[in-house]
A protein has these predicted regions:
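Phosphate/pyrophosphate-binding loop motifs in nucleotide- or prenyl diphosphate-using proteins
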Residues: 1-183
C-alpha cells in the first residue's frame, strides 16, 4: 500500500518545486495555501452548476490555472528559470483569457453600479464567497510573487470574473440601499 504522507513536514517546513525547503509559515506556503483554499471554494461553486455548462467550463479552467499559479508560488526564486509559461508559471495569455471571459459575460447584462447584498441564489452566494477567498489569496500572493510575475494580476482578474459570474447567475440584484432598515 502506498503511504499518503511523508512526515517530512513534521519539523515545520515544506518542500518546494524543484527543491528546497522553507518554513510553513513563510510567504510562499502561506500564499500557496490561500490559493489552494480559493481553488477549493471555486470547486464548491462548480458543484452547484450544471456540468458542461459555460459556467462549469470557465470555473474548471480557473481551477486548472490555479494549479499553474501554485506551482509558481511553490518555487524558490533561484529556480524560476525552470518554470514554463502556462504550465508552471502564469502567462500573459492566461491573464488575457480571464479578461476575455469577464468582458464577454459583462456584455450580457447591466452590472449593478452599487453594492449588492449576496445570497440571491445558492450558486451566486458561493461565487461571491469564492471571490472573497481569491481576494485574500491575492493579498497573500503580493508578498510572495517574484518581480514581473503575472500571478497577482491573474488573481485580480479572477476575482472580477467571479463577481461578474455571481451577478449574471443571480439575475435580479438586491442592492444594499434597497434593504429596509428600522432606523
Amino acid at each position: 500500500m502506498t503511504r499518503l504522507y511523508t512526515g517530512t513536514g513534521d519539523d515545520g517546513t515544506t518542500g518546494l518545486l524543484f527543491g528546497g525547503r522553507v518554513p510553513k509559515d513563510s510567504a510562499h506556503p502561506q500564499a500557496t495555501g490561500a490559493v489552494d483554499e480559493a481553488q477549493a471554494a471555486i470547486g464548491v461553486s462548480r458543484s452547484l452548476c450544471e456540468r458542461g455548462s459555460e459556467l462549469d467550463e470557465a470555473l474548471t479552467l480557473a481551477c486548472r490555472d490555479l494549479w499553474v499559479l501554485m506551482a509558481e508560488l511553490a518555487t524558490l526564486p533561484d529556480n524560476h528559470g525552470k518554470l514554463a509559461d502556462g504550465k508552471t508559471r502564469v502567462s500573459a495569455e492566461m491573464v488575457a483569457a480571464i479578461e476575455a471571459l469577464v468582458d464577454d459575460l459583462g456584455e450580457r447584462f447591466e452590472a449593478p453600479s452599487q453594492f449588492v447584498v449576496p445570497g440571491q441564489t445558492p450558486l451566486a452566494a458561493q461565487l461571491d464567497l469564492a471571490r472573497t477567498v481569491v481576494r485574500r489569496a491575492e493579498r497573500e500572493a503580493v508578498g510572495a510573487a517574484a518581480p514581473g510575475s503575472r500571478l497577482v494580476p491573474y488573481l485580480n482578474r479572477l476575482s472580477s470574473l467571479l463577481w461578474v459570474q455571481a451577478r449574471w447567475v443571480e439575475g435580479e440584484h438586491l442592492l444594499s440601499r434597497d434593504v429596509a432598515t428600522d432606523t
